[in-house]
C-alpha cells in the first residue's frame, strides 16, 4: 500500500487535467494459429462511417475472435464511436465483451479499461476494474496500473490518491515501479514537484528502485520549472546509482543546456552518447544545431550538420527549418538558398516567416534569379499558401 502522508502536504489539486505516461501493458494482438481477418469484414469495419451501422457491424462480430482479437479493428471502432459522441454504443459493446469468455483474461480487461479511458468514460473504466471478479477475472498490478492510468487523465486528483491508498490493500495488489511512475508523472504535469520527489522516496522505501523513466520525468519537470540545481542533482544521483540515461534523458538535458545558451556543453553530451551506446536522433541534432546558432557560433552549427550527414543521418523538415531560419539570421543567404531548394524539392516547406526572410535577403544581395527560383517552388506547395500570403511574398520581388 502506498503511504501518502508525506506527499499530501505538497498537493493543492488544481483543476487542470493530469496526463500520465502510457505504461500499461496490453496483451499482444498476435493470436497463434489464427488466420488473418477476412478482407470483407476488415473493409466494412474500416470504411463504415455511420456510427449506428458501425456499432451493429461490430456487435454482429462480437463472438468472432478474428475481429475482437484484432487490436486495430477494436480500438478504431471505439475511437470513431467516441468521435461521433456515441458513448452509449461504446458502453454496450464493451460491457457485452466482458460477459464473453475473453472477459476472464486480464490482458483483455486491461484493453477494455484503457478503451474506456481513451473515450473519456472514467467511471466505466473504474467499474470494470472493481468488478473483475464478477467475470471470473483475477486482478494484478497490470489491471491496477490500467485503472491508475485512466485516473491520470482525470482532473480529480483526490480520486487518484484515494485509489492509490485503498485499492492495493483491498485487492491484495503489490504496486510496482510503473505504478509509482504514473503517479510521479501526474504530480509533475501539475507542477507539484515536491510531491513528485516524495513519491520517488516512497518508491525507494517500498523496496523498488527508481528507473530511468522515474529520473527522466523528474529531471524534465524540474528543468521546466527552473529548478535547475535540483534537476542537475538528480542527474548526478541517477549516474551515481548506476541508472543509465536513455535517449529521452539525454534530450531533456541537452534541451536544458541549449536554453541556457550552453551550446558547447550540449555538444559534449552529443559526443558522449555513442560512447554509452545511446544513438542521438534528429531531435538531438536539431537542438545542438539550434544551440550553436543561439550562442552565435554559426560555423559550429554547420559543422554539426555536416557531421550528422557523415554519420548517415538525413535532415528532416525540422532540421531544414532550423538551418534555413538561422542561416538567414546569420546573413548566410547562399547556403540558406541551397538548403531551401533541397527542402522544397522534397515537398517540405519552411514556415512563411523563414521563406520571407530568405527572399528579402536574396533580393537585398541582388540575387533576384535565386529569389524567383524559390518563388517557383513556393507555388508548388500542396496545400498551397493562402492567396494573401502569396501576394505578400511576391511583393518582395
Curated annotation (Swiss-Prot):
It is found in: Mitochondrion. It comes from the Eukaryota. It comes from Arabidopsis thaliana. Residues 1-81 form a transit peptide. This is Pentatricopeptide repeat-containing protein At1g80150, mitochondrial. PPR repeats lie at residues 105-139, 140-170, 176-210, 211-245, 246-280, 281-315, 316-350, 351-381. InterPro entries: Pentatricopeptide_rpt, PPR-containing_protein, TPR-like_helical_dom_sf. PANTHER family: MEMBRANE-ASSOCIATED SALT-INDUCIBLE PROTEIN-LIKE, REPEAT-CONTAINING PROTEIN, PUTATIVE-RELATED. One of its GO terms (cellular component) is mitochondrion. Its main location: mitochondrion. Belongs to the PPR family. P subfamily. Pfam families: PPR, PPR_1, PPR_2. Keywords: Mitochondrion, Repeat, Transit peptide.
